[in-house]
Amino acid sequence: MSLELNTIKVNPTGWGPVGKLEKFTDIPYAPFSKGDKIGKCSDWNSNVRNYQRQNYGSNAFNPFTFKLEDDEDSFTLVDYTRVQNKLKNKGKTYQKQFYQQNKRGGSNAGGRGGRGGMRGGRFGSNNKYWNDRRQRNRESSIEILSSWESKEEFDLSTFKQYTVEQLPEPETIGTYGQVKYYNKVYDRINAKNEKKLQKTENSVPLIPTSDDKVIRSEYMNGNVYATDSILAVLMSAQKSVYSWDIVVQKVGARLFFELRPGTSEHLTVNENLTAHHQDDKDPINTTSSLSQEATQVNLNYWQQVLSQNVEPFKFDNELPEGDEFENCVDVGYAYKKWDLGDDIVVLARTEIDGVVEGLPGQPPKFISIKAINEHDSNRFGIEFRKKLDSQRAAILATEIKNNSTKFAKWSIQSTLAGCEMLNLGFVSRDSIRDNNNHVILGTQFYPVADLNKQNGVDMKNCWGILKHIAQTCMKLANGKYLLHRDPNRNVINLYSVPENAFDQIEEETQEEEEEEQSKGWVEESRE
């Protein structure tokens, strides 16, 4: 009998094997250490802090780490144990005691911990999220088509470097409309003397930039046209987290920034909160539901705190006649222009919310009126009803931290409109499960300059960002473009879109022909 030996490869130049084995060809090589943890076993005694911490070893980038691919919410365990008859009465007594103890301070109570449950303060309302490590991809504000050509990509992390040497001086072109006076009765409202928030049936007029009759008549005063809300979106872009988009029209040496047709301005809620700030399983606390609620609360609060029996303050000119002002609230518009240098002159429509009486011998002062609404204080901040009267500064700091983008837009819009004061209302739900009824718990006036400083808003940097975007768009050919804030990357993409993109189909061709004739001033600017 003979012994057959396998082929042995010899390495004459060093130690170790040579060549490759075919059975190992398709196995990828991944470096690892024997001290690394291969995934993580179940540890029911660990707490939330230990679960979130990875002291060493594998992490999300290690190929050996176990990853949850499917949603296990539908997975349940079936209890097949048999209940013994002799423990029947004793079991009922124990279950009754356990229920009563959990009702006092169980795992989801979030209050004073009961004897039979976990400590409420630590594992209260957030305990249902301790095992929720799913990556949440934010939704895009619009579907990006493959046929759109990418022209530019703005890195938001570099926006801090753009600035202007001096703040541009605003020049008022004209003022239109009327605004009502602030009712000082609401200064006496506090958490113990709350007032129900009333609902208004009127809406805010939505006038696209290119359809604004005043901008049409005064278009020679600038070459970049927008509204204060659109300018605020661009100026606060580096703080934004959620996706947004703005349409850009390049006509000759002029730029028009406006909202996409069919869309309206909505406020965000807890946009800058890094924790679990959206609950997809709760229909009233989703991102879209909270946004609609905050937008309606702001409109209702704005109209309620204005005096209805006092003659409103009228500006120099009346609003142009048009259907867009029917069933709308009283608004005041101030059209202003800013010269940023390098042939960039901005002409914008700014909005004024209200007016307060000045000191004796002084003219009235224009103000902005906004509101923050509380929907779940156990998860997102300090409870308004308990701490508003004693810790109002702490509540404001928490709200600015969680809503830095929204506060930046508000203060920028107020600065552009020339409003030195902002009236902020503190509104809460009448019931935590009711997003339709709210109460006013307090009001406070804040200097706009202080809000800018507290939120880290530098107007020189804001104007520098706008100038950089405008100069980039000025280099483009005539056409329609879209500025899109990527939902999951810290960039803004500039796409070239067809001329008929986003156009709404209208049945009445007569109105379309009149619209084309009235835009002759745009064609003139092409020359």
UniProtKB/Swiss-Prot annotation:
Location (main, coarse): cytoplasm
Keyword Ubl conjugation set for record: no
Compartments, as annotated in UniProt: Cytoplasm
RNA gate as annotated region, ranges: 264-277
InterPro entries linked: eIF3d (IPR007783)
Record's compositionally biased regions (Acidic residues): 504-516
Region (Disordered): 100-136, 503-527
Keyword Glycosyltransferase: no
Domain of life of the source: Eukaryota
Pfam families, per database record: eIF-3_zeta (PF05091)
GO CC entries: centrosome; eukaryotic 43S preinitiation complex; eukaryotic 48S preinitiation complex; eukaryotic translation initiation factor 3 complex; phagocytic vesicle
Protein name according to UniProt: Eukaryotic translation initiation factor 3 subunit D
